[in-house]
Amino acid sequence: MVLCFPLLLLLLVLWGPVCPLHAWPKRLTKAHWFEIQHIQPSPLQCNRAMIGINNYTQHCKHQNTFLHDSFQNVAAVCDLLSIVCKNRRHNCHQSSKPVNMTDCRLTSGKYPQCRYSAAAQYKFFIVACDPPQKSDPPYKLVPVHLDSIL
């Protein structure tokens, strides 16, 4: 039985994180996953920037938008007036000013060799916000989903 435990442990490590396309890695809070996916104060080339996201999900994400702003500034949008989200919930908030962002779109490749094109944009955004979890920053609400770009 002693030999089985190391083998089981090895299998768990090699299996790695596997999550569906619509889910976030369960070891992260939704706000932390939002930050990983969408907050990038200084623009990076899409192929490099998407590695971090794709390594969590173990697949090439088809499209992703990076907001070139701080988590603190995006979280401040959660204090603005609530509006209806695409999913009909009432926890969305629109930015009061446009921000620089990069839209990354998958052009070719299979994980881990994902290749992306980039489009720089200067637009408003809408985020869904929820109360923070224990390990989140201590804001009243934190961004958990990028609902749309305007």
From Swiss-Prot:
The protein's predominant localisation is: secreted
Q: Which SMART domains match?
A: RNAse_Pc
User: From the record, what ranges are coiled-coil?
Assistant: none
Q: Report a single Gene Ontology molecular function.
A: RNA nuclease activity
Which keywords accompany this UniProt record?
A: Antibiotic, Antimicrobial, Disulfide bond, Endonuclease, Glycoprotein, Hydrolase, Lysosome, Nuclease, Secreted, Signal
Q: Where is the signal peptide?
A: 1-23
Task: Give the protein family.
Answer: Belongs to the pancreatic ribonuclease family.
Q: Which protein are we looking at?
A: Ribonuclease K6
Native organism: Gorilla gorilla gorilla (Western lowland gorilla)
Name the gene. Answer: RNASE6
